[in-house]
C-alpha cells in the first residue's frame, strides 16, 4: 500500500553480540557518532526472477535468505574459512538470470583487514566461492552488481576504484577509465547505463 502500513517479516537476523552494541568511548565522555554500533541489517535485495526470495546481510557478518516472502529464514553465511566473523555485508545482488544465484560484497577493513571479499553462490547459499582474482589484495570491496542484459558480466566497486568481470567473477580487470581514484560506494545498472556513486567525488 505504498508504505502506508508495515509488518515485521523476520526475527533478528544479526548476531546481536552484547560486546558490539554497547556504548563506546568514555569513561567520562561517550562517543555520539553511532558508527561503532553493530547488529544492523546493512543490505537487502529481492530476486528479480523469483517471487518471495529475499536476501539480507548484516553489518556483523550474517547472510540470510527467505524463499517464502519472509515466513521463514535460513542462515546461509559463508563459512569462517571464507568470511571473517564480523565481515560487514555491504551489498547483495541476486542474479537476473539464474535462480539461487547471488553476488555479495563485504568488507572487514575496520579490523585492519583490507582484502576484498566478493562472493558468489549458485545454490541459495548452500555453498559459496570467493571471486576476487585480479583485484589487488589491499582494495577492499564496497559493491558488486550484475549486468541486466549480458549474463556473466559483473561490476565491482572497491575502495580504490572500479573492476569488471566478463566470466561471472572468475577473473577481474581494472575498469577505471577516467574515474577519479576514490572509493566506489555503490553501483546501479539502469537500462544501458552503469551509475557509480563515489565517496566525495560525485556520481558518474
Regions found by a protein language model. Give the residues of each.
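Beta-propeller blade termini and top-face loops
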Residues: 1-204
Amino acid at each position: 500500500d505504498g508504505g502506508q502500513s508495515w509488518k515485521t517479516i523476520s526475527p533478528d537476523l544479526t548476531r546481536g553480540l552484547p560486546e558490539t552494541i554497547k556504548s563506546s568511548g568514555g569513561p567520562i565522555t561517550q562517543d555520539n557518532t553511532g558508527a561503532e554500533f553493530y547488529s544492523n541489517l546493512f543490505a537487502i535485495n529481492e530476486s528479480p526472477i523469483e517471487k518471495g526470495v529475499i536476501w539480507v546481510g548484516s553489518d556483523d557478518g550474517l547472510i540470510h535468505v527467505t524463499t517464502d516472502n519472509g515466513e521463514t529464514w535460513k542462515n546461509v553465511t559463508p563459512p569462517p574459512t571464507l568470511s571473517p566473523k564480523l565481515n560487514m555485508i555491504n551489498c547483495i545482488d541476486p542474479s537476473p538470470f539464474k535462480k539461487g544465484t547471488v553476488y555479495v560484497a563485504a568488507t572487514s577493513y575496520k579490523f585492519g583487514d583490507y582484502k576484498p571479499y566478493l562472493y558468489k553462490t549458485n545454490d541459495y547459499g548452500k555453498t559459496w566461492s570467493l571471486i576476487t582474482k585480479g583485484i589487488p589484495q589491499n582494495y577492499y570491496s564496497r559493491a558488486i552488481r550484475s549486468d541486466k542484459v549480458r549474463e556473466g558480466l559483473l561490476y565491482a566497486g572497491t575502495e580504490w576504484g572500479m573492476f569488471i568481470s566478463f566470466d561471472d567473477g572468475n577473473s577481474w580487470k581494472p575498469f577505471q577509465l577516467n574515474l577519479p581514484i576514490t572509493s566506489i560506494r555503490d553501483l546501479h545498472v539502469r537500462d544501458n547505463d552503469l551509475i557509480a556513486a563515489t565517496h566525495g567525488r560525485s556520481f558518474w
